[in-house]
Regions:
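Canonical positions in the second alpha-helix
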Residues: 59, 102-103, 153-154, 190-192, ...
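Intrinsically disordered, low-complexity terminal regions enriched in Ser/Thr/Pro/Gly
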Residues: 426-751
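Residues within mature, well-folded domains
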Residues: 175-176, 212-216, 237-491, 498-514
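Residue-level recognition of tetratricopeptide repeat
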Residues: 66, 110, 161, 198-199, ...
Length: 751
């Protein structure tokens, strides 16, 4: 058989000086082992490696106590295992373990024997039988624990043995149960007093382990030490960013994106692992194919769109993701990677790292409410409630074969066995058997425990025999809907403190030569304010933030401002503090969200859709209707020098005229157009009103000659003859060539 040049070179040092027992491994011996490992790593011909193995075995028979020979045989067997499959690979890994054990018996103070044994234990793995592998983990006999013990011993006999310390740290971080994190940390801290203390891979490993045990300050110090000597170390920048995120440090964002841009392949693996649960497949595919700048653009757009939609500061959602990731890794990691599913477990995440609670937590954070029910004969179970603007989400989890593996199921009834769920349809027959009686008792206990989450559980408890089937179907549909939404979206609602009632108004009006504007107006009742006493009266700080997002998800405007209103007197509970913020926006259709906070609490509006008319061009445009009253002192000066008024409460006394302002664009100078204005009752009520759209309480029609550019129209409406109630103020503009635009504003008339 043809020999590789590398093997010819290897023959030169097959016979070596016999090591002296009890003496530490010399630098020359370590270098010799590393050269041997490097040389066989490039060989892919298993036959050539087996020939070398035969030669080494022959030498070992003549010199059985030569630890160097056994180390070579061990690393050679590992390489043969890598090039083999199935049982043959396992035999090679088993041979490697035997050779390394022999080496440790001959030279227990040499680190390489223990180091190699750690790799052999990892390669051998755990039992293929889930029950057996579970017991191995519980008893600390699993592959990760065995390998961690071996790596720990390599660091114990040589505290400065960098390779062993790095593998010990990596293995401890991978362990899902009985993690040797304390052993790894102690070994790494001992290494800080050795000549290897400043080895980059050692500092990186320690930074990770310090963070994993919660020592964020120590993690940051160690990683900063590494970065001070090598600021270009991409992995160090990535790990420092993760630590800084958990500390709430604003520097984390730049570090994280900077490391992502650098494009180091080892760091990219970490980035992808961190992001793959949330990023859609389409973005992941682009991520994999992109260069550094494009990767940053893709990921930044993903996270910032979430910041803007939920009204957080830019970068906040990314930091929250890493806080969630840290929590999930601590609390919801799977003990076993092997997962089998029952017929009632319809959702299958494809995850082997976290259970289904971890998936939901990563996407939506901590639940608003969490409920468990424990009783003999009932599987471990949890239900999580998330209160959301678009509708509450309830998730049910049950752990059957593995108490650490909670699965997401469609219905609370799926906590029971599949057969028991089917038997619930015949309550009379169930009550006649001990098993049936136990199932009914468990069902009642489960339902009572979930009553705080949703009214349907109280209804299920109160329904008569034979009437539960429809409610059970409805309850299951709620769970199916929650799974469909919860496993494909993510959320982080803005926390604005205690909820307060605030009137807000979003009016796309106020265009000038520089473009269109959105008027964000608010009216806060005095009871929702907490005044600060200042010289000369009282101060009322109000924080207002919001975002304007187009239909493709791109942010066109965002704002976050705090204004302090001063008043000589305290604002009484029945009165309002009013304010306005103009926001520059382009023409188009957008969704808008606004959050408002006072010292007493806050509120977040639902997503509202606005249409901003183009202030220039040939398209006939009509702005939103600015509607107000002099009694509500909220006006601004238009470019024409007139006053336009807003009233966020939308409530008007009959004695106060309604002040209307709107803008018409898209016509040439001198063109005529028709305006029809109606104040009518909204549809609803009697059949006549529903058919014909309600009664018109006030109508006004007039013609206008357009001045070119923007025509600013103001009218004062007398509502003194209107009866109290809700009305719709509608304005319709029609050009001579038949084009027509329409806007509506709701208002309420009171005595």
């Amino acid at each position: 058989m043809r020999q590789f040049p590398t093997l010819i070179a290897l023959q030169v040092f097959l016979v070596c000086a016999r090591p002296v027992p009890g003496i530490g491994q010399s630098p020359a011996q370590r270098a010799e082992i590393e050269r041997f490992r490097d040389s066989i790593a490039v060989i892919t011909d298993a036959g050539a490696l087996r020939n070398l193995e035969t030669d080494l075995i022959a030498q070992a028979r003549q010199d059985r106590s030569n630890a160097m020979l056994h180390l070579r045989l061990g690393f050679l067997a590992l390489r043969l295992g890598e090039l083999s499959d199935g049982d043959q690979a396992r035999r090679h890994f088993d041979d490697a373990g035997s050779e390394f054990e022999w080496a440790t018996q001959e030279q227990p103070n040499w680190p390489y024997g223990w180091y190699g044994l750690g790799f052999a234990e990892l390669a051998l793995g755990d039992s293929e039988i889930p029950l057996v592998s579970g017991f191995q983990m519980m008893l600390g006999k699993d592959a990760l624990t065995r390998s961690a013990n071996a790596f720990a011993r390599s660091a114990e006999v040589d505290p400065g043995f960098v390779a062993g310390l790095v593998e010990l740290s990596s293995t401890a971080l991978r362990q899902r149960i009985n993690a040797r994190m304390d052993v790894a940390l102690a070994a790494l801290r001992r290494a800080s007093r050795t000549p290897s203390a400043n080895a980059p891979e050692l500092l990186l490993a320690r930074g990770r382990v310090e963070r994993a045990v919660g020592s964020l300050d120590s993690s940051a110090v160690v990683l900063q030490k590494l970065l001070s000597t090598d600021s270009t170390n991409v992995l160090a920048r990535y790990e420092m960013a993760r630590t800084r995120f958990l500390e709430g440090d604003s520097e984390a964002l730049g570090l994280w994106y900077g490391a992502l841009s650098a494009g180091d392949s080892s760091a990219l693996d970490h980035y992808r692992e961190d992001l793959e649960i949330l990023l859609p497949d389409s973005i992941l595919q682009q991520f994999d194919a992109a260069n550094g700048a494009r990767r940053v653009e893709l990921v930044r757009q993903f996270w910032e769109s979430r910041d803007d939609d939920e009204l957080h500061a830019r970068g906040a959602r990314l930091a929250e993701h890493y806080r969630r990731l840290d929590y999930v890794r601590r609390h919801y990691r799977l003990v076993s990677e092997r997962r089998r599913y029952g017929i009632e477990e319809r959702y299958r995440s494809g995850q082997s790292e976290y259970d289904d609670r971890g998936i939901i937590y990563l996407r939506h954070g901590a639940p608003d409410e969490r409920v468990r029910y424990s009783a003999p004969g009932i599987e471990p179970n949890e239900s999580w409630l998330y209160r959301r603007e678009s509708g509450d989400l309830i998730f049910h989890f049950v752990a059957r074969e593995d108490v650490q593996d909670f699965r997401l199921v469609e219905s609370l009834f799926d906590v029971l066995s599949f057969a028991d769920v089917l038997s619930l349809n015949d309550t009379e027959e169930m009550g006649a058997t001990p098993r049936g009686a136990a199932v009914m008792q468990h069902t009642e206990g489960l339902l009572r425990s979930r009553e705080p989450l949703h009214p349907i559980y109280s209804r299920l408890l109160g329904v008569g025999r034979g009437g539960a089937s429809g409610l059970m179907t409805e309850e299951r549909r709620l769970g199916q809907n929650a799974i469909a939404i919860g496993t494909t979206t993510d959320s982080w609602p803005l926390d604005v403190g205690e909820p307060i009632e605030v009137n807000t108004s979003l009016v796309a009006v106020g265009a000038d030569s520089t473009g269109a504007q959105l008027q964000v107006a608010f009216a806060i009742p005095g009871e929702a304010l907490a005044p600060r006493e200042v010289e000369g009266g009282f101060a009322y700080p109000v924080r207002l933030r919001g975002s304007v997002i187009d239909l493709d998800g791109r942010t066109v405007a965002r704002f976050d401002t705090t204004r302090v209103f001063r008043n000589r007197e305290r604002i009484e509970p029945q009165r309002h503090l009013v304010g306005r913020l103009p926001v520059r926006v382009p023409a188009g259709t957008f969704t808008v969200r606004v959050a408002l906070e006072t010292d007493r609490g806050g509120m977040v509006t639902a997503r509202d859709t606005i249409h901003v008319a183009p202030p220039v061009g040939n398209e006939l445009g009509l702005s939103d209707l600015a509607v107000g009253a002099r009694a509500v002192r909220l006006a601004w000066e238009t470019p024409a020098g007139d006053s336009a008024w807003l009233n966020p409460t939308r409530t008007y006394r009959r004695t106060d005229p309604v002040l209307l302002y709107f803008e018409v664009s898209g016509l040439e100078q001198g063109e005529e157009y028709e305006v029809r204005l109606e104040l009518r009752r909204p549809r609803g009520g009697s059949i006549f009103r529903r058919l014909f759209g309600g009664g018109v309480a006030l109508r006004m029609e007039f013609d206008q000659v357009h001045p070119g550019g923007i025509d600013r129209v103001s009218r004062e409406l007398d509502i003194g003859r209107l009866s109290s109630g809700d009305y719709s103020l509608e304005v319709r503009v029609k050009s001579d060539d038949g084009r027509e635009v329409f806007r509506r504003q709701l208002l309420r008339v009171v005595e």
